[in-house]
């Protein structure tokens, strides 16, 4: 073969090899392309599927209830009206409880100025049950009788009334540990939003949920630092993570976070996203509760509504977003201050603050509360609220559905009652022993609304509530029911009726004998009915009760609100040998001292759902349970008990208040009771031991002392009892045997229900003085 033909042969082989290689490459590329586009299509389908799933999940949360919202509980709404007797000092106390700030000249909501006869204040805006009310600048003028004028300084006119916003009591316990106070977007101060964006997400209004610029900026900072010191997540990404994802540092979580942020940004407005973030962000702990949202964090750290915080305080909260535990101002004050000042500096650099404003803000102290708490704890009262919510709402009650509950709690009464127990129990325990316990409840005398409740000497302890659950013998607290039963028969009994105080022995059906004795072991021979009750004498009470009949007294107790199944019909029940809770005693005495009108005890006033719909509203349910005149006369005798009977310790300190009261002591001094009544409240106090051992305390030496301490803090309102129809005063002369005799002209007077006008006729038919002298001559 020639060289030329050989070369041609090699050329053909080379071309053939190249052609084969090219063909293989094309086949390989074709396969890659085929696999690639299939994979891409599959990936796209997966992404679409994931997107649809994530979109559905986001829509379900955002267009339903985005958060678990706690049931928010408020104290009573105080309505100020000229002529209602409210003193200037009492209003100051109310404003202090509501954390109003005393200043020289009010400029902002939540501030007031005070003089000797005036208070100028700017009432905070609040969304009441019947609608929202804006902030309002008013001048309140007082005279010797109390509040006499309310003037709107903006409208230059007098107002008939003014409502103060209620105190936030706290949130009811729920399954989730998250707690938040939801605010609408327009309720957040704009300077807070500006500070947050300049610190956490400067491109918020420009990006679509994910910010490549922020990611790049974070990468540069982290590379320079040699470690992760700055994240590139937008607020939208943080929101997606907080609501839907865990905090795991994985690529898969970051990808889902970014994808969800894009969907959220596409579906919802920037303001809607901001509202969600501002209410969702975690900002610390209060015990076991996780505090979410700026609204509740403001209450936790500063004890003030968010709208009233200074710029430096808002900056502190914004600074804590990066690490609430690390920058906790209550534990790491200097670290928190540095972070706050950094936020303030960023605000100045971005023209949110001027240089002078910045300088003023960085020089301010942190001004956080001494202890991190949302509100004062009233666990006993909260238990009552929970019970009533379940009773009134049934299946509608869900603790995480954002209900707003308005109660009748009086924050001044509550705090002063707690303070009285804190002060007195250590002193009384020196006599009774360290295991001495307490329970107390104060109710409105007319409406039956529960104004305060303390379940034990550890007032903030959420445990056994003795007001509701400690059923103890009531001792002499039963006696007014015995005398009420008698006074309901005015043709047979009145306050001047003579009762025998002589040795008495009662025989039982099985031959047993019971001999009641007075506490002092003395017998007085004869005693007027009113004094037997005032001095809480046992023997006359038992004698009277047996004459009336045990069933009759038991029926009276039933009318006053006592479950008759609790009462064993034996003679000793006339001295309180049966057991009631302080709650049941409070109901009994509310009815008695309200001229026989029973108003069921209640803590709820109204309940609103998240949209503001009224789910429950309390309506007056007062009924005449016992004769008005008989109840009034019994209460009068209880007033005498404070003046000259077992409650006279009170009269020495509060004589001008004309108080009524009743002591109660059980066998071996196991229980010490006192029920005190002023013009405002019926307050029931019990002292004893959970193991039912003796305390060495009587009602007068124990529970009454707690009540007296309470009145030192909570100035009593004078008890005025409007005279019912048919009650007339008559003169009586004291007899040597101890009883009373009608003496129409005598200076010593007693009110009498003279329904058949027997005493009136006796006085009208008596001989005149000159005729008597004539016969004497």
Swiss-Prot record:
Keywords associated with the record: Antibiotic resistance, Carboxypeptidase, Cell inner membrane, Cell membrane, Cell shape, Cell wall biogenesis/degradation, Glycosyltransferase, Hydrolase, Membrane, Multifunctional enzyme, Peptidoglycan synthesis, Protease, Signal-anchor, Transferase, Transmembrane, Transmembrane helix
Reactions that this protein is recorded to catalyse: [GlcNAc-(1->4)-Mur2Ac(oyl-L-Ala-gamma-D-Glu-L-Lys-D-Ala-D-Ala)](n)-di-trans,octa-cis-undecaprenyl diphosphate + beta-D-GlcNAc-(1->4)-Mur2Ac(oyl-L-Ala-gamma-D-Glu-L-Lys-D-Ala-D-Ala)-di-trans,octa-cis-undecaprenyl diphosphate = [GlcNAc-(1->4)-Mur2Ac(oyl-L-Ala-gamma-D-Glu-L-Lys-D-Ala-D-Ala)](n+1)-di-trans,octa-cis-undecaprenyl diphosphate + di-trans,octa-cis-undecaprenyl diphosphate + H(+); Preferential cleavage: (Ac)2-L-Lys-D-Ala-|-D-Ala. Also transpeptidation of peptidyl-alanyl moieties that are N-acyl substituents of D-alanine
Signal peptide: none
EC assignment: 2.4.99.28, 3.4.16.4
UniProt membrane topology term: Single-pass type II membrane protein
GO term, biological process aspect, one: proteolysis
Pathway the protein takes part in: Cell wall biogenesis; peptidoglycan biosynthesis
Segments of this protein annotated with the region Transpeptidase: 415-709
Gene3D superfamilies: Biosynthetic peptidoglycan transglycosylase-like, DD-peptidase/beta-lactamase superfamily, Penicillin-binding protein 1b domain
Location(s) in or outside the cell: Cell inner membrane
UniProt key word Membrane: yes
Annotated InterPro entries: Beta-lactam/transpept-like, Glyco_trans_51, Glycosyltr_51/Transpeptidase, Lysozyme-like_dom_sf, PBP_1b, PBP_transglycosylase, PCN-bd_Tpept, UB2H
Membrane-spanning residues: 31-52
Cytoplasmic compartment segments: 1-30
Region entry Transglycosylase, spans: 162-334
Residue ranges that the UniProt entry lists as topological domain Periplasmic: 53-777
GO molecular function list: penicillin binding; peptidoglycan glycosyltransferase activity; serine-type D-Ala-D-Ala carboxypeptidase activity
Zinc in keyword set: no
GO CC field: outer membrane-bounded periplasmic space; peptidoglycan-based cell wall; plasma membrane
Active site (record annotation): 200 (proton donor), 476 (acyl-ester intermediate)
Purpose of the protein: Cell wall formation. Synthesis of cross-linked peptidoglycan from the lipid intermediates. The enzyme has a penicillin-insensitive transglycosylase N-terminal domain (formation of linear glycan strands) and a penicillin-sensitive transpeptidase C-terminal domain (cross-linking of the peptide subunits).
The family this protein is said to belong to: In the N-terminal section; belongs to the glycosyltransferase 51 family. In the C-terminal section; belongs to the transpeptidase family.
Name of this protein: Penicillin-binding protein 1B
Annotated source species: Vibrio cholerae serotype O1 (strain ATCC 39315 / El Tor Inaba N16961)
Gene from which the chain derives: mrcB
């Amino acid at each position: 073969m020639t060289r030329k033909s050989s070369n041609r042969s090699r050329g053909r082989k080379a071309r053939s090899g190249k052609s084969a290689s090219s063909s293989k490459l094309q086949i390989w590329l074709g396969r890659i392309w085929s696999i690639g586009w299939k994979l891409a299509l599959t990936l796209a389908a997966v992404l679409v599927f994931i997107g649809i799933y994530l979109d559905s999940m986001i829509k379900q949360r955002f267009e339903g209830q985005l958060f678990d919202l706690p049931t928010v509980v408020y104290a009573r709404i105080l309505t100020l009206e000229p002529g209602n007797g409210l003193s200037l000092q009492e209003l100051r106390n109310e404003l202090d409880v509501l954390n109003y700030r005393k200043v020289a000249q009010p400029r902002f909501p939540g501030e007031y100025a005070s003089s000797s006869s005036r208070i100028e204040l700017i009432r905070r805006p609040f969304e009441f049950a019947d609608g929202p009310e804006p902030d309002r600048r008013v001048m309140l003028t007082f005279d010797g009788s109390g509040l006499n004028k309310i003037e709107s300084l903006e409208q230059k006119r007098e107002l008939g009334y003014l409502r103060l916003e209620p105190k936030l009591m706290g949130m009811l316990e729920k399954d989730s540990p998250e707690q938040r106070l939801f605010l609408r977007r327009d309720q957040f101060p704009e300077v807070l939003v500006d500070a947050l964006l300049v610190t956490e997400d400067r491109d918020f209004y420009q990006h679509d949920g994910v910010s490549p610029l922020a990611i790049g900026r974070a990468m540069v900072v982290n590379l320079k630092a040699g470690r992760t010191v700055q994240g590139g997540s937008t607020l939208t990404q943080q929101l997606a993570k907080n609501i839907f994802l865990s905090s795991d540092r994985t690529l898969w979580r970051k990808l889902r976070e970014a994808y969800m942020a894009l969907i959220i940004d596409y579906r919802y407005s920037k303001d809607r996203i901001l509202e969600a973030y501002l209410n969702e962000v975690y900002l610390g702990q209060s015990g076991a509760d996780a505090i979410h949202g700026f609204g509740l964090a403001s209450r936790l750290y500063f004890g003030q509504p968010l709208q009233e915080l200074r710029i430096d305080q808002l900056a502190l909260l914004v600074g804590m977003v990066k690490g609430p535990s690390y920058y906790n101002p209550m534990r790491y004050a200097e670290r928190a201050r540095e972070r706050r000042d950094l936020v303030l500096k960023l605000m100045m650099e971005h023209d949110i603050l001027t240089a002078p404003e910045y300088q003023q803000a960085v020089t301010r102290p942190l001004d956080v509360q001494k202890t991190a708490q949302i509100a004062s704890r009233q666990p006993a009262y909260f238990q009552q609220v929970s019970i009533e919510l379940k009773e009134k709402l049934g299946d509608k009650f869900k603790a995480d559905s954002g209900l707003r509950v308005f109660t009748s709690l009086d924050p001044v009464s509550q705090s002063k009652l707690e303070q009285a127990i804190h002060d007195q129990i250590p002193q009384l325990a020196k006599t009774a022993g360290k295991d001495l316990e307490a329970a107390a409840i104060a109710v409105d005398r007319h409406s039956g609304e529960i104004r305060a409740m303390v379940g034990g000497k550890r007032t903030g302890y959420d445990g056994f509530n003795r007001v509701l659950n400690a059923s103890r013998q009531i001792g002499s607290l039963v006696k007014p029911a015995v005398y009420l039963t008698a006074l309901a028969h005015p043709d047979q009994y009145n306050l001047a009726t003579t009762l025998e105080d002589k040795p008495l022995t009662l025989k039982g059906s099985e031959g047993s004998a019971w001999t009641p004795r007075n506490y002092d072991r003395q017998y007085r021979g004869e005693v007027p009915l009113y004094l037997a009750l005032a001095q809480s004498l046992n023997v006359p009470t038992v004698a009277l009760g047996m004459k009336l009949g045990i069933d009759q007294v038991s029926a009276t107790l039933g009318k006053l609100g006592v479950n008759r199944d609790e009462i064993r019909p034996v003679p000793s029940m006339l001295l309180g040998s049966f057991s009631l809770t302080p709650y049941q005693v409070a109901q009994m005495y509310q009815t008695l001292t309200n001229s026989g009108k029973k108003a069921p005890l209640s803590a709820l006033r109204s309940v609103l759902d998240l949209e503001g719909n009224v789910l429950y509203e309390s309506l007056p349910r007062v009924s005449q349970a016992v004769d008005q005149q008989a109840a009034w006369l019994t209460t009068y005798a209880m007033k005498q008990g404070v003046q000259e009977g077992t409650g006279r310790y009170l009269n020495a300190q509060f004589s001008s208040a004309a108080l009524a009261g009743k002591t109660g002591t059980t066998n071996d001094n196991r229980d010490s009771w006192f029920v005190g009544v002023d013009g405002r409240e019926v307050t029931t106090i019990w002292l004893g031991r959970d193991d039912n051992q003796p305390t060495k305390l009587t009602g007068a030496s124990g529970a009454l002392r707690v009540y007296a301490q309470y009145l030192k803090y909570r100035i009593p309102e004078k008890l005025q009892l409007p005279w019912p129809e048919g009650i007339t005063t008559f003169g009586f002369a004291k007899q040597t045997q101890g009883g009373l005799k009608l003496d129409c002209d005598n200076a010593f007077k007693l009110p009498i229900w003279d329904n058949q006008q027997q005493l009136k006729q006796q006085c009208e038919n008596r001989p005149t003085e000159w005729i008597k002298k004539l016969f004497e001559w």
